[in-house]
Swiss-Prot record:
Keywords: Cytoplasm, Metal-binding, Protein biosynthesis, Zinc. Binds 1 zinc ion per subunit. This is Alanyl-tRNA editing protein Aarsd1-B. Its cofactor is Zn(2+). Gene3D superfamilies: 2.40.30.130, Threonyl-trna Synthetase, Chain A, domain 2. GO terms for molecular function: alanine-tRNA ligase activity; ATP binding; metal ion binding; nucleic acid binding; Ser-tRNA(Ala) deacylase activity. Functions in trans to edit the amino acid moiety from incorrectly charged tRNA(Ala). GO terms for biological process: alanyl-tRNA aminoacylation; regulation of translational fidelity. One of its GO terms (cellular component) is cytoplasm. Zn(2+) binds at H108, H112, C208, H212.
Length: 412
């Protein structure tokens, strides 16, 4: 049985009845991480909310006043995951997030159109696709799609949109002769009942459970951004449909305006200007590295030139890297001197190096790391890593001064 959202993809609400409600848990993404959330699985007599399937993400919306967090298909049922319980046999009004739904419809129907044209023009078969949050990707079974072919596919797709081609939804049985003629990647193992066909009139007929536009004119436009190398002998075609094209143009124009202001030139000169800046930065970084190395050597020589230099050397700099610290350690020598070197912000995070007699470093390296709330490792008289509490540096110095006072280090 098809859900109401599949029979009428443009319906935004539906009065229906709660069949069941059971406690459940589900992993939901929040801030890029998946966390297990407790809630309830709700079954309805029918639903206007599309459950995830056919490469299309699920809908969002409300059952009464209760937000629907996920909709998942389980066999013939659409399971609605919600945070609050709903009473069975209760009549409820189900509403969808139309902006999300229509976006998915535009991308999904756009994929059908691009897939059909790529096949009819060049015999490129679609092996999979992904409806992403920002852009969608069609995986084509070919190692190469040329720029000319991309342009031709896009041109024909937009021509069909301008021709106002109708899109029909039909249901057929698996024993219907047409079943073996339509494009398909197979039915789910738990599929039952009629097979749903999305028919773009005169262009394509394809098995699909997703929601689609009723006319290609509702796609507004299609823009193929380009291609990327896919899996072995496959090419990924990146595209946008409908409102996503308008949003992409708006973002691109705002970026162009910002770059024009920053670079003090016109859009046609942006690439050349950025290229010059990158080369200048690379040259400056190279010069800076040379100066840091020279500074490391001079710092070490200055310490060694002091008659009363002692057996402990401590230094902190905001600028530098691991190489800077290791050059100092190499130049001073660690057989008769204990060195504590740090790089970075004095109050937050940075890098550290403890170098000296292996016995001392091996014993106190982990303690230094602990005080600095860092992570690191050591061998051969050196313990280095990253520190999260550089503000604790003074505490480390006190500890190491006590170590020097209590442990005899042979000095030339």
């Amino acid at each position: 049985m098809a859900f109401h959202c599949q029979r009428d993809c443009y319906a935004t609400e539906l009065l229906t009845e709660v069949v069941s409600c059971h406690p459940a848990q589900l992993k939901l993404e929040n801030g890029g991480k998946k966390n297990t959330v407790s809630g309830f699985n709700v079954l309805l007599k029918d639903t206007v909310l599309f459950p995830e399937g056919g490469g299309q993400p699920d809908d969002r919306g409300f059952i009464g006043e209760v937000p629907v967090l996920r909709v998942i298909r389980q066999g013939p049922d659409a399971v609605h995951f919600v945070a609050s319980p709903l009473d069975p046999a209760t009549e409820v009004l189900v509403k969808i997030d139309w902006n999300r739904r229509f976006d998915h419809m535009q991308q999904h129907s756009g994929q059908h159109l691009v897939t059909a044209i790529a096949d009819s023009l060049y015999g490129f078969k679609t092996t999979s696709w992904d409806l992403g949050r920002q852009r969608s990707v069609i995986e084509l079974d070919t190692p190469l799609v040329t720029a000319e072919q991309v342009e031709a596919i896009e041109k024909v797709a937009n021509q069909k949109i301008r021709e106002h081609v109708p899109v029909h939804v039909r249901l057929i049985t698996v024993d219907d002769p047409e079943f073996d003629m339509v494009r398909s990647r197979g039915l789910p193992d738990d599929h039952a009942g009629p097979v749903r066909i999305i028919d773009i009139e005169g262009v394509d007929a394809n098995m699909c459970c997703g929601t689609h536009v009723r006319n290609l004119s509702d796609l507004q436009m299609i823009k193929i951004l380009g291609t990327e190398k896919g899996k072995k002998n496959k090419t990924n075609l990146i595209f946008l449909s409908g409102e996503r094209v308008l949003k992409y143009v708006s973002r691109s124009y705002n970026t162009e305006k910002t770059l024009t202001s920053l670079l003090k030139n016109g859009p046609e000169e942006h690439i050349e200007a950025v290229d010059k800046l990158q080369k200048s930065v690379k040259a400056l970084q190279k010069n800076n590295l040379t100066l840091l190395r020279d500074l490391a050597v001079l710092t070490a020589e200055n310490f060694k030139s002091k008659a009363d230099r002692g057996k402990f050397f401590s230094l902190h700099r905001k600028e530098g890297d691991n190489e800077f610290m290791n050059i100092i350690a190499n130049e001073i020598g660690t057989e008769d001197t204990l060195l504590f070197l740090t790089i970075g912000d004095e109050k937050t995070s940075g890098l550290f190096l403890l170098a000296g007699p292996p016995g001392i470093v091996e014993k106190f390296g982990p303690r230094v790391c602990e005080i600095l709330d860092g992570k690191g490792a050591g061998k051969c008289g050196r313990f280095q890593g990253k520190a999260n509490k550089m503000s604790q540096r003074a505490e480390v110095e006190v500890l190491l001064q006590k170590v020097i006072s209590s442990v005899e280090i042979t000095q030339e």
